[in-house]
C-alpha cells in the first residue's frame, strides 16, 4: 500500500537524482569522472533490462568497461567501451576482439569530437565490425537511462 508507493517513489527519485548529478558535471571535470559515470549508468541499465551487468569485465588481459550477460556462465551478449577523451583505436580493438571471441554486440560511447575518427577507423582498420558496432553518444546513454527508469515506473504503476 502506502509504504510501498512511498518506497517506489523514493527509489525512483534516487535514480533520477543520480542521472541529474551525472548530467550536471562541469565540462572541465568531465574526463575520467564522466567516463566512470557513463560506465556506471550502462551497468545500471543492464541490470534494469535483466542482464548480469558487470564493469571492468576481463578480456584476455584487458578490461571492457561494461559487459552484459544473459546467464551466469555465459559469454557477454553486449559489450561497451566508453571513450571520453581516451584511445579510440584501443577501444575498437577490444570491441572487435569481444565480437570475434564471443560474437558479442559491440557498443562504443563517444563524444561528438571523436565521431569522425571512429568512422574513419571503421571504414578502414576495423571494417569487419563496421556493420555490427553501435555508436552512442553520452546524450544517448543518458536518454536510455531515463527511458529505462520511466518504463520501470510505468510497469510498477500498472502492476505489471
Features from the language model and the residues they span:
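Nuclease-adjacent, charged terminal/linker segments that flank catalytic cores
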Residues: 1-26
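Catalytic core segments in nucleotide and nucleic-acid processing enzymes
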Residues: 81-114
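Active-site beta-strand-loop-beta-strand hairpin of nuclease catalytic cores
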Residues: 67-79, 99
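Domain-level recognition of nuclease-like catalytic cores that cleave nucleotide substrates
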Residues: 58-60, 113-160
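A short acidic, amphipathic alpha-helical/loop segment
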Residues: 41, 68, 91-98, 121
Amino acid at each position: 500500500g502506502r509504504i510501498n508507493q512511498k518506497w517506489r517513489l523514493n527509489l525512483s527519485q534516487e535514480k533520477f537524482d543520480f542521472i541529474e548529478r551525472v548530467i550536471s558535471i562541469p565540462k572541465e571535470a568531465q574526463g575520467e569522472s564522466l567516463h566512470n559515470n557513463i560506465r556506471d549508468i550502462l551497468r545500471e541499465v543492464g541490470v534494469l533490462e535483466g542482464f548480469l551487468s558487470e564493469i571492468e569485465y576481463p578480456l584476455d588481459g584487458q578490461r571492457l568497461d561494461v559487459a552484459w550477460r544473459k546467464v551466469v556462465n555465459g559469454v557477454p551478449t553486449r559489450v561497451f567501451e566508453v571513450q571520453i577523451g581516451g584511445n579510440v583505436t584501443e577501444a575498437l580493438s577490444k570491441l572487435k576482439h569481444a565480437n570475434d571471441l564471443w560474437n558479442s554486440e559491440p557498443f562504443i560511447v563517444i563524444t561528438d569530437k571523436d565521431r569522425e575518427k571512429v568512422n574513419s577507423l571503421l571504414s578502414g582498420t576495423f571494417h569487419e565490425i563496421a556493420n555490427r558496432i553501435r555508436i552512442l553518444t553520452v546524450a544517448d546513454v543518458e536518454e536510455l537511462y531515463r527511458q529505462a527508469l520511466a518504463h520501470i515506473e510505468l510497469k510498477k504503476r500498472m502492476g505489471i
